């Protein structure tokens, strides 16, 4: 079907977003054309501002608008415990449980040989650097319950145990192949309560 070039560009751009197929991209594009121009400008401005002002925390790798992030600079949090997650969005899911008061470390991915992602492409060196002063007593591995997440957890477990730090893994009542961001608060709270050392 023929669309004017600007509309085609918008549909194509929206279709590049995760979880947005061609039909949804089309619906979103048509919706954006119907809303008042001020709403479209507000959306465009919000996207640009988020891209310009959101950075990675130099300590944990979480998204932030200041460095270090609010979690890393909070004196009320337990600085002797680090919870390792794959993506920054996983922190939001875990924080909703209100069960964990330690710090985080975002790997920005998981080991996936099929995709050419090894430990070198993840923020493993930065994690090791955080452990060298001896203040961290426990590292909780909260990677996803899929093949890549399990591979990453096993790799980190083996690596971190040589440093003498306690390494635990979240107990999962989550389906294998599931992502943390989609889990409900009760399931995540139980997972924190039942975490265990890998054997």
UniProtKB/Swiss-Prot annotation:
Keywords: DNA damage, DNA recombination, DNA repair, Metal-binding, Zinc, Zinc-finger. A zinc finger (C4-type) spans 57-72. The keyword Hydrolase does not apply. GO terms for molecular function: DNA binding; zinc ion binding. GO terms for biological process: DNA recombination; DNA repair. InterPro entries: DNA_Rcmb_RecR, Rcmb_RecR, Rcmb_RecR_Znf, TOPRIM_dom, TOPRIM_RecR. May play a role in DNA repair. It seems to be involved in an RecBC-independent recombinational process of DNA repair. It may act with RecF and RecO. Belongs to the RecR family. This is Recombination protein RecR. The lineage of its organism: Bacteria, Bacillati, Bacillota, Clostridia, Moorellales.
């Amino acid at each position: 079907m023929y669309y004017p070039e600007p509309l085609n560009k918008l549909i194509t751009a929206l279709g590049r977003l995760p979880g947005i197929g061609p039909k949804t991209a089309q619906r979103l594009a048509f919706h954006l054309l119907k809303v008042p121009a001020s709403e479209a400008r507000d959306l465009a401005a919000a996207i640009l501002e988020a891209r310009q002002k959101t950075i990675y925390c130099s300590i944990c790798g979480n998204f932030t608008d200041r460095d270090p992030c609010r979690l890393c600079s909070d004196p009320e949090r337990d600085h002797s415990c680090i919870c390792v997650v794959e993506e920054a969005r996983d922190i939001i899911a875990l924080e909703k449980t209100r069960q964990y008061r330690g710090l985080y470390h975002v790997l920005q991915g998981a080991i996936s040989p099929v995709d050419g992602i090894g430990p070198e492409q993840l923020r493993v060196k930065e994690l090791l650097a955080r452990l060298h002063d001896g203040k961290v007593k426990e590292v909780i591995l909260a990677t996803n319950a899929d093949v890549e997440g399990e591979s990453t957890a096993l790799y980190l477990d083996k690596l971190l145990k040589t440093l003498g730090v306690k390494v635990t893994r979240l107990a999962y009542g989550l389906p294998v192949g599931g992502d943390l961001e989609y889990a409900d608060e009760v399931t995540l709270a139980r997972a924190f309560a039942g975490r265990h050392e890998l054997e």
